[in-house]
Amino acid sequence: PVGSIEVALTPERLNYLVRRTEFAASWGFSAEMLSPEECANLNPLLDPTTFIGGFHTTGEGIGKALRGAQAQGERAQSNGATFIGNTTVTGIETVGSKVTGVRTATGVIPADLVVIAAGGWGSSIASTAGVTLPLVSMEHQYAVTEPVSVLAKGRDGDASVPFVRIYEAGTYVRDEGDKAGIGSFNHRALPVSDSDMVNNAANLEDPSKLPFTQVDWDQAWVETLEVMPVLSGLKYEQAYNGVFPYSADGFPLMGPAPSVDGLWILECLWATHSIGAARSLAQAICGIAPDIDFAPADLTRFDDAELVPADFAQRCDNAYIDTYAIHHPAEPSTSPRGVRMSPFYDEQENLGAAFFDTSAWERPRWFESNAGLLAGLNVPARDAWSSKFWSPIAGAEHLKTREIAGIFDMTSLRRINVTGRDAAKFLNYAAARNVARGTGAVTYTMLLDHNGGIVSDVTISQLAEDRFFIGGNSPRDVVWLKSISAGYDVQIEDVTNGTTCIAVWGPQAREILAPITDTDLTNDTFKYFNAKETSVAGVAVTAVRVSYVGELGWELACNASAGSQLWNAVMAQANRVGAVPAGRSALTSLRLEKGYRAWGSDMSREDTPTSAGLDFAVRTDGEHLGLAAASARATTRRLRTLSLTDIETVPTIGQPIFMSGKNVGYITSAEFGWSVGHPVALGWLPAEINEGEVVQISCGGTTVNAVVAPDAVFDPTGSRIRV
């Protein structure tokens, strides 16, 4: 390794690089900020007068992809693998929904398990099995100069000085012996179609090297020379447009193809991912819980609505162009938008909803119609970074929910029906506690993998002896349930797209719903963690008495066709009592005050119920998948609630936690707790750190103190939710 330097030309970039040093600390990597002079001392190509600082890490290096592939190939052969070289793959053979082989120019190779790891050709190969991969191959410019006077002569092409990224120029520069190699993202997206990829493979000696387009290079080169003027006047010994695939969100595509049994995907990888990604996928194929949860890269994160070629092609273009952009964790997509909307989207838009998108769903963060609630509200000053994509209106919605009620759009969450003769037996096995407890019973629990890791946290409502309704998190929940259902007479149906869900939460939730339903909502008749199929405002709903904000209330799920009718009826009653529509920002601050976890940001398959603080949601009352394995795992870290003492600093995801100067963990979620008057966060800490101890959080170069708190800093007994 030779290390790397990322230079900042603007104060905004410099602040972002400071945060990158913090993220590096969270993941155990050594990184530091350097002055321009210190950067130039490490890499003589840099002119220290042209930039204002740099991020430096020593662990980065140049990956030799061919050497790596050769070494892995030799190891595989020594373990019995056979390679068939110079063979054109023309498709995947299937019978029904099962893979049966690989079709080549010389015949069919029988196989009941196939992994597509074909780089830019992966999309066209997958399409022969009826699988759409949201990826597009992109041209990427690269040039190598003639020898540079300040670089060491006579080297064999290996790097000897740190790799440099010049984000504002959209370029990176490395030394290739005594020459400079420059790559550029500073150009328009140049997608290569699947058909062109196939034609290039047939007609070009190296189909991953296309002709250099000078018009796309000139601006990037000018901006690079501003930081490295020593390269001025040099000619290029090589210049070409390379080709590699980009996914719709810039992350890899891994995991089983949902529609074809035995077909697995390993695409959109860079050399840095290769061995780790291959190991994780191999573990998953063998039925072993991967050491590293690849949920952010799991193919199933893309729902069917996100697999429209024109839409994901646009997202792939954006992902390429934004490779070197400053990314904020709360930043919404720019395009395409409006792909998936709740049935009452127009009504929300009329209320001034500030929308963001998740899995292509439009979700309101807050409502401008609530701006009048800011009068008299004490809003603490907030740091610039956490103020992005945020509004104090969210605080007003939070407080109004605690005072009266909030109406929340929960449409984007996963809704699953599980039915059949073995439905109860199957779910008792799949869940970490018995869920077949009688019609009307609602159970909060987890789905665990074979290693005891948390696949998802779910609420399971028993609607009949053989019929259950699950509130889940993502399409992955459905794929997981189906993958472990062999041998059970059970049907698993994702009903998210044809349904919607509205949550009514707050002290006056009963006053809102009682006038528009004949169902008795009193506590004696409709208890907490109970469900009923009933009617609200003439709409057939599944009413589930649960709450993600720690207040009395119900989630109302119904057919999407009746969603607008239900929303309008609920909002009419909400207006009558002074309740308000509320967005996801308020939901986050409300749940954090209660210590409620969010799967995906706070916990993953790498965590157990014990480490995540969810032991209360499991029971050793039967044979539950993964529970014994979870119990056998040592608990070395725990997810803890943190109360911050600095009311003006709200951490963001991934920022490091220190104790006595040592990095001990990182933040998973944070928001200002409007009911308690200070920021509240969840973060991972060593198991031996106890409640009441003080830690420090590094937030954009500022260090703030936080106290390890009880899980719930608001209404710790849960009395408000059970009235």
Where are these regions (language model features)?
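Central helical "cap/lid" subdomain
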Residues: 104-160, 292, 563, 580-581
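Acidic, proline/glycine-enriched N-terminal capping motif
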Residues: 301-448, 453
